[in-house]
Amino acid sequence: VPERNTPWPYARRNPPVEQITRKRPPPPARLLRRLARSLGIHPDDPEPFVGRLVGRRALIVCTNHAWLDVGRPTGLFASEMTVPYYLFSEAGIDVDLASPLGGMIAVDPLSFRSVVRTHHDDRFLVDDQLRAKVVRSLAVADLDIGAYDIVYFAGGWGAAFDLGFSDAIGEKVTQANAAGKVIGGV
């Protein structure tokens, strides 16, 4: 992950694998997270999915747009990629990441602040496999969209600058819709 996507010291820690699900932010951030959750931000799912969807494939389409026109870094909001990625993976779905140009997916550094970070984001920070997928995303134009059961669009400010203007994405979404694929986003 590029340096601009991991600007905080805690992003460089690599706890043992058995601690990933228990990784916790500092106490003030935990308190603020609880307050944010009580206000409806990143609520826990009262009825989590428990099925297995082995053999299915999902594509998460992310942005390459890394900078706002005012010179500030932007990209996708981390939880809008990490939450569906881990939920799909835990259900047994094979997940690929794609972007309009392929290669580096821009991640908004503000989405890693302790208060707004989810436990899925905490997991991403120590997950070398997903971090490698973020660095080497697939180019949408090169994909066989028919090979995927789900096409999901991850949001964030960067997505507003390139996802809606990509001819390749428009073509692939049209093909996915015609084939009856599940298409969603946030």
Where are these regions (language model features)?
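Extended, subdomain-level signal for the structured scaffold at the beginning of enzyme domains
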Residues: 2-179
